[in-house]
Amino acid sequence: RTMNQETFQIFLWVMSAVALVVFIALYFVKAGYGMFRTASWGISINNKLAWVLMEAPVFIVMFGLWGKSGAGFAVPVYFFFLLFQLHYLQRAFIFPFLLKGKSRMPVAIMAMGIVFNLLNGMMQAGGLFYFAPEGLYADGWAYLLKPHALLGIILFFAGMFVNLHSDYVIRHLRRPGDTKHYLPGKGLYRYVTSANYFGELVEWTGFAILTASPAAWVFVWWTFANLVPRADAIHRRYREEFGDEAVGKRKRIIPFLY
């Protein structure tokens, strides 16, 4: 444990500043995975394998740091840990194997994802197990019944549901062997072109409200900085590909707003 409270605060500020740079940059450079993959991103590997290698590190780091911290099974922190791990269990070990088709991911994108996930694992574990404000979680089970905690839990699971349902909708747009793009129109896709990203944003916002952890809010900001510009790029691509009429009044990521 080479960090102290002060170093951890600096770490959070640096991560927040880098997220701002990423947010601005992604409006100019489209991250080359999915529909935006081009040869210029260099060597690529199988998409399923890439997702596992990219998302598994945060699951492993979080588990390791939880074990090392001695936080044990004390509620509410253990409950936060389980929610976080539930998301990444799905994202690293289930989601990749549900992906259809033979698409590939540039190794450069995967490497950036791995670096972020390692840092985020340290950030979230630090915020929950090592540097949580004194006495914040002292109420045990009673903490989970506080209004903000209940709101956070509801948002977390609502966001997770939207995220999973939206991924399901996207997977079932194509018949086997088909490689064309289609405009998704079910569920929250009636309101936004990137409903899966909206779900993820709501999920982590719920987590941050629930845990009241500054580190979790930095992660919300990172999620926003990463997904909002991409949702904008997808929205533009859909308008080019399917026309303004087909896209209609749908927003990019936040229903009715953006």
List PLM regions with ranges.
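Hydrophobic transmembrane alpha-helices
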Residues: 4-24, 62-66, 73, 116, ...
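Membrane-helix and juxtamembrane interface regions of eukaryotic multi-pass membrane proteins
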Residues: 3-90, 94-111
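Short helix-to-loop capping/linker segments positioned immediately adjacent to catalytic or ligand/cofactor-binding
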Residues: 96-103, 122, 138-142
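Membrane-interfacial, low-structure loops and terminal tails that flank and connect transmembrane helices
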Residues: 37-40, 136-142
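Juxtamembrane interfacial secondary-structure elements that flank transmembrane helices
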Residues: 24-37, 89-93, 102, 127-133, ...
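Active-site pocket-lining segments that scaffold enzyme catalytic pockets across diverse folds
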Residues: 108-127
